Amino acid sequence: MKRFAAALLALFMLTSCGTAESSLPEPETVAEATYFQQDREQLGELESGYIPVNFEHMTGEWFPYMGYEEYMHGRSEEEFRASVRERYSEAKSDGVNTLYLHVHPCGDAYYRSEIFPRGVSWDGDYDPFAVMLEEAHELELSVHAWLNPLRCQTTEQMDGLPDSFTVKKWTENGIAKQVNGRWYLDPSHTEVDDLLRQCIRELITNYNVDGVHIDDYFYPTAETDFDAAEFAESGSADLGEWRRSNCTRMVKAMYSEVKSCDSRVEFGISPQGSINGNYNSQFADVRLWSGEKGCCDYIVPQLYFGFRNETCPFAETLALWESMTCPDVRLVAGLGAYKLGKADKWAGAAGENEWIESPDIIQRQIELVERSSAAGYAIYK
């Protein structure tokens, strides 16, 4: 680990922005990061078909849909395959063992779906997710299909969809609601749970996924008019508690569907790093989700804060997440390498320039995570 940490520090100091060129350290020992190979081989003797690959020590990297416009749109299958092979090989060489690949970012699909329309960057006649899976598994990387449960298309994109799609129909009956030019599903409706179950079943049935992963897009607004009619009809007294219960019901439905399809496939959640922000702004009850069995297998709080952040200093915030994560849930620390070389205007005066002044900040955060009770880290570049 020390050899790779030193390489990481050197590379950060050579790059002004610290973007995709960063190098991540390998876990300290092979044993910590070895997926359960013996179990996998034993299961393979008993069962036919794919055996999901997951790692005890997770070192993850997100590959968001925004990049698809660059290396998917207008590309042949061969060109796309070469691009993802290069990216995943770089991740592998950086010590990454788990990829979160965006397949359902905005009410759409970057896989062959009978439920959702194609993503806007997918214009080829090949299946991009099949290609991504093949290339990742060839490198012995674990692949978690990354979904955004509630975020849908922009107003313009939705207007262009055929009326046959469920998400389009829901714009007419209030299950989907518009906020700042984009549509979002309202989790107070149990029909949303059913749609997400279908999505998960479609993915696990048709693709050799190792996990399903969601991030921090829960309620898009704290404004009371978003779901005023539904709240009034519910008879609940506390809007915040009611919204949190809606999100928890949805999360548990997704977890249950994953395990129903294949108990060996993992389900993970990556909420924002601020515990209070989760609880009061997005109505994500992360204390509950990380604190008891049945909501997720692992949780990846986005700890995109410097050590000098005045609101959520990294070390103290990591410790808070450690204290509330139970033994049945693995804590993985999300690290914001995309901030390197940039001012952080939300960090307060003490931390605003930390990502500029401290090019070794990610390396130091990794070292702290490795000394903590967390089961790994994940990088957002």
Question: Can you annotate each of these PLM segments?
Answer:
Residues T15-S16:
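C-terminal motif of bacterial Sec signal peptides marking the signal peptidase cleavage site
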Residues G44, I51-R81, H144-E202, N206, ...:
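Active-site-adjacent "subsite" loops/lids of carbohydrate-active enzymes
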Residues G49, F80, R87-E90, N97, ...:
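Polysaccharide-binding and catalytic clefts of secreted carbohydrate-active enzymes
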Residues T59-F63, L99-L101, V143-A145, V212-I214, ...:
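Hydrophobic faces of well-ordered beta-strands that scaffold small-molecule active sites
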Residues E69, E77-E79, H104-A109, W122-D123, ...:
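Acidic-and-aromatic substrate-binding clefts and catalytic sites of carbohydrate-active enzymes
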Residues A82-D108, N206-G211, C295-Y298, V369-G376:
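Catalytic domains of carbohydrate-active enzymes, especially glycoside hydrolases
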Residues R87-Y88, H104-N148, G235-C261:
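Aromatic-lined substrate-binding rim segments of carbohydrate-active enzymes
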Residues K293-P313, L320-W321, P327-K381:
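Substrate-binding cleft of secreted/luminal carbohydrate-active enzymes
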